[in-house]
């Protein structure tokens, strides 16, 4: 009983000191039973058995007729025991949760390790994939190269096929060159006794040769000319391939189309040509005779060129504009002299107009443009030769149309002067055109000369 009052039980539950103050023997028995129950059942029974035991003890105490204070104490004990049981349950739940958490962490750690182990072989797989890709690319490149090589080989074979034909053509040309060289040797042997005759032909030609008489190249050049002439006779050349050259520089032409004299002092090695070039020479026999025929044609055609088209044009112009009365303009062949003469004639005609209209009013002739704008100058010039045609004093400078009409109509009727100027044009222009006025005055002068009203030095 002493242990239950102030000390704690083995399972950690404390007994309140009120249990020791209980005066009733029933209550003391209940306390003892409770203590014994706590000691005996703490190790074996769980919280549920403990609660049932307490309920039984309470019921017994109730049946024994204990006091209400004891009932309250029992209720408190029940609640304490239930709270402890709940705390134990919670502690066990916490322990179970901790265990579950530990198991989860271990499982997670195992999974992490598994993942690490799984991730470790990934670089190897990537490497294998890359190697496979590289191998496939290399195979493709090799296939392309082999295809290109095969194509190139096929092209080379195709190109190499016509080569035998070319070789055959080259052999044919070599054979032709050999035969031509043999023919040339025969021609040279035949040409040696004929050299004097050829020299006689060349000396008889009219062409001039600028070669020194004692130079050693002269004989070689003469021999080459002879050979070229004889080769032209032996080897025919088509006129389409070798047209005649229009140049007249020497008696014969070399294979290059130049005369041997034009080369000057050339060495024998430089002047000699290959056998393939010699047969194609466009030389023809006796070219000096053709040149003789051509030379007179040029001499005859030179003086037959037409001369003096300008003189004919001048005559036509002077006949049209009445320049015959003006004098020696057609005699000038130099353009500068002709221009000076025309300027002199123009000035002379201007001075003549001034002299004819000197005493007339409203007339001051200084040129062939503005001085004739009012029409009074035309009227004064015509009134000078035909004073009975109209009264000059009645004319008004402001009436331009009347003045032009009177002057042109009177000149046409009395002097047979063509009306080269239009009245409307003269009225429309404030300053008349000098060329038009000069042409009309020139025509009027010619008409007056034909009428005998103006005397010239020639007549």
UniProtKB/Swiss-Prot annotation:
UniProt KW keywords: Calmodulin-binding, Coiled coil, Cytoplasm, Muscle protein, Nucleus, Phosphoprotein
Subcellular location: Cytoplasm, Myofibril, Sarcomere, I band; Cytoplasm, Myofibril, Sarcomere, M line; Nucleus
Cross-referenced SMART domains: CH
rRNA-binding listed as a keyword: no
Effect of residue 301 to A: Loss of phosphorylation. Loss of nuclear localization
Disulfide bonds: none
CC annotations in GO: contractile muscle fiber; cytoplasm; I band; M band; nucleus
Tissue: Widely expressed, with highest expression in skeletal muscles (at protein level). Within striated muscles, significantly more expressed in soleus muscle compared with plantaris muscle or white vastus (at protein level). 30-40% lower expression in females than in males (at protein level). Expressed in type 2a fibers, but not detected in fast twitch type 2b muscle white vastus nor in oxidative type I/b heart muscle (at protein level). Expressed within myometrial cells of the uterus, as well as in the endometrial layer. In the aorta, confined to smooth muscle cells.
Chain positions with Phosphoserine modification: 301
Positions of the UniProt region annotated as Disordered: 1-314
Recorded coiled-coil stretches: 124-154
Reported consequences of knocking out the gene: Male mutant mice perform better than wild type in exercise stress test after endurance training. Females do not differ significantly during these tests. Even in the absence of endurance exercise, mutant mice exhibit muscle fiber adaptation, i.e. more type 2a fibers and lower levels of type 1b fibers. Endothelium-dependent vasorelaxation of the aorta is enhanced and responses to beta-adrenergic constriction are reduced. Expression of PPP1R12A is 30-40-fold higher in mutant mice than in wild-type littermates and exhibits a steady decline as the animals become sexually mature (at protein level).
Maturation and modification: Maximal phosphorylation of Ser-301 correlates with maximal relaxation of aorta in response to acetylcholine.
Main location: cytoplasm
Sequence ranges of Low complexity compositional bias: 260-283
Domain Calponin-homology (CH): 343-449
Ranges annotated as biased composition (Basic and acidic residues): 42-55, 75-105, 112-168, 185-211, 221-232, 287-300
Biological process (GO), any one: muscle organ morphogenesis
UniProt xrefs under InterPro entries: CH_dom, CH_dom_sf, F-actin_Monoox_Mical
Induction line: Significantly reduced by exercise in smooth and in skeletal muscles.
PROSITE patterns in UniProt: CH (PS50021)
Function: Plays a role in the regulation of contractile properties of both striated and smooth muscles. When unphosphorylated, may inhibit myosin dephosphorylation. Phosphorylation at Ser-301 reduces this inhibitory activity.
Family, per entry: Belongs to the smoothelin family.
Complex and partners: Interacts with PPP1R12A.
UniProt protein name: Smoothelin-like protein 1
Protein species of origin: Mus musculus (Mouse)
Annotated gene: Smtnl1
């Amino acid at each position: 009983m002493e242990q239950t009052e102030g000390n704690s039980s083995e399972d950690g539950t404390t007994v309140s000191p009120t249990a020791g103050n209980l005066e009733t023997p029933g209550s003391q028995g209940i306390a003892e039973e409770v203590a014994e129950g706590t000691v005996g059942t703490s190790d074996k029974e769980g919280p549920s058995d403990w609660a049932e035991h307490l309920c039984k003890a309470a019921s017994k105490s109730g049946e024994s007729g204990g006091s209400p204070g004891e009932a309250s104490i029992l209720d408190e004990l029940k609640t304490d025991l239930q709270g402890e049981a709940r705390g134990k349950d919670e502690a066990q739940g916490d322990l179970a949760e901790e265990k579950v958490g530990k198991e989860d962490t271990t499982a997670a750690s195992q999974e992490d390790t598994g993942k690490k182990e799984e991730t470790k072989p990934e670089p190897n797989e990537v490497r294998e994939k890359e190697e496979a890709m590289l191998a496939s690319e290399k195979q493709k490149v090799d296939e392309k190269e082999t295809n290109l090589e095969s194509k190139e080989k096929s092209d080379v074979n195709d190109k190499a096929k016509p080569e035998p034909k070319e070789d055959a053509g080259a052999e044919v040309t070599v054979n032709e060159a050999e035969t031509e060289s043999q023919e040339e040797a025969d021609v040279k042997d035949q040409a040696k006794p004929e050299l004097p005759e050829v020299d006689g032909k060349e000396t008889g030609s009219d062409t001039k040769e600028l070669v020194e008489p004692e130079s050693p190249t002269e004989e070689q050049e003469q021999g080459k000319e002879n050979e070229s002439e004889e080769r032209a006779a032996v080897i025919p050349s088509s006129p389409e391939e070798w047209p005649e050259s229009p140049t007249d520089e020497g008696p014969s032409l070399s294979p290059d189309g130049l005369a041997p004299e034009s080369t000057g002092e050339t060495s024998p090695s430089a002047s000699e040509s290959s056998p393939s070039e010699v047969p194609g020479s466009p030389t023809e026999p006796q070219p000096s005779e053709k040149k003789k025929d051509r030379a007179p044609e040029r001499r005859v055609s030179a003086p037959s060129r037409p001369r003096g088209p300008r003189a004919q044009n001048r005559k036509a112009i002077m006949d049209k504009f009445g320049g015959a009365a003006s004098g020696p303009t057609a005699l000038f062949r130099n353009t500068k002299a002709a221009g000076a003469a025309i300027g002199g004639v123009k000035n002379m005609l201007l001075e003549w107009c001034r002299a004819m209209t000197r005493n007339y009013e409203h007339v001051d002739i200084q040129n062939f443009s503005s001085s004739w704008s009012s029409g009074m100058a035309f009227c004064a010039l015509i009134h000078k030769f035909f004073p009975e045609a109209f009264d000059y004093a009645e004319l008004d400078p402001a009436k331009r149309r009347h003045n032009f009409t009177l002057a042109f109509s009177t000149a046409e009727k009395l002097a047979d002067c063509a009306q080269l100027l239009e009245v409307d044009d003269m009225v429309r222009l404030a300053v008349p055109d000098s060329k038009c006025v000069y042409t009309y005055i020139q025509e009027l002068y010619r008409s007056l000369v034909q009428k005998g009203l103006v005397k010239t030095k020639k007549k």
